[in-house]
Curated annotation (Swiss-Prot):
Bilayer topology annotation: Single-pass type II membrane protein
Record flagged with keyword Aminoacyl-tRNA synthetase: no
Domain of life per record: Bacteria
Compartments (UniProt record): Cell membrane
Transmembrane segments: 30-50
Protein name in UniProt: Cell division protein DivIB
InterPro entries: Cell_div_FtsQ/DivIB_C (IPR005548), DivIB (IPR026580), FtsQ_DivIB (IPR050487), POTRA (IPR034746), POTRA_FtsQ_type (IPR013685)
Location, primary (coarse class): membrane
Length: 296
């Protein structure tokens, strides 16, 4: 017995194909609509102020001013982001000797982001009668023409190995410590070739050794506070702090009277009660700090 073949409903197939065509046209219209919108958005972005660079978010600069960075970015005419060459801008910025590294990141909209990594100014010196900065690797920026920040010590009289020793010491200090020093002068003696004089910004003179000054100067704020001062902040008993060996306060009277031959490690003989108290307070302050550090 032969199996009967089912009849195909032509009307049903026609209706199904019709619905499929309608659905396909809807999808096609949707795709075309989306493409049109995308093209319009691109045109709006490219030919309206939306794509203009109007500002820059600058981070990491300390010595180099924002105005100097903006000048090298060259965005005052509001260039369009997609046409702006960040590589060229980075090259211009790196011509500043205080800038070590710089990266410029662009998004679809402004501002652009500028990340600056600067060299650290560890000292100020004189080159051909011009005050110029010295950076962390010991390089003197001889052609530096901008204003030198007044937050690093001025150094004088250092050459050769002793200059290298001083640079090493300054590298070990943090920015806050260096900023407390106004000037450093080389003052070698026969028995102490590494002796230096530091003139602090609070008016106190410090004598030290280039090999140990970085470690000892960390305690300077407490040393300074331990010394008795008048209402104007000046020392009641003028003198200097000797850090060449240990920590000692030496009144200038002792030096003038010949009680100490130099700013050396020699202990000062007992003076007046106020002198002894100043020395004791200074030594106690240093001992206290060292005890606290060792207990951490």
């Amino acid at each position: 017995m032969t199996k009967e073949i089912p009849k195909i409903n032509n009307e049903y197939l026609k209706e199904k194909r019709k619905k499929q065509r309608i659905q396909q046209r809807r999808v096609q219209r949707m795709i075309v609509g989306i493409l049109v919108v995308i093209v319009l958005l691109i045109l709006v972005y490219m030919f309206t102020p939306i794509s203009h660079i109007k500002s820059a978010d600058i981070k990491g600069n300390h010595y180099v001013s924002k105005q100097d960075i903006l000048k090298e970015l060259d965005i005052q005419n509001h260039p369009r982001i997609y046409a702006y060459s960040s590589d060229d801008a980075e090259t211009r910025l790196k011509q500043n000797e205080l800038i070590d590294e710089v990266t410029i990141e662009k998004g679809l909209f402004n501002p652009i982001e500028v990340n600056v990594k600067e060299h650290t100014i560890i000292a100020i010196t004189t080159e051909k009668s011009r005050v110029v900065p010295m950076i962390e690797n010991g390089k003197v920026l001889k052609d530096y023409k901008q204003e030198v920040p007044n937050e690093a010590p001025y150094i004088e009289g250092f050459k050769g190995a002793e200059k290298r020793n001083l640079i090493d010491a300054l590298q070990k200090m943090d920015r806050t410590t260096r900023a407390q020093i106004s000037e450093i002068v080389s003052a070698p003696q026969k028995d102490q070739p590494h002796l230096i004089k530091l003139f602090m910004r609070d008016g106190i003179e410090v004598v030290g050794n280039t090999n140990t000054i970085a470690e000892k100067l960390k305690y300077y704020p407490s040393m300074s506070q331990a010394l008795e001062k008048d209402e104007t902040g000046k020392l009641k008993k003028s003198g200097f702090i000797d850090l060449s060996v240990g920590a000692t306060f030496i009144p200038y009277d002792n030096v003038n009277n010949g009680q100490t031959s130099s700013a050396s490690a020699k202990e000062v003989q007992s003076g007046t009660a106020s002198e002894d108290k100043a020395k004791d307070d200074l030594q106690k302050a240093l001992n206290k700090i060292k005890d606290e550090e060792s207990s951490e």
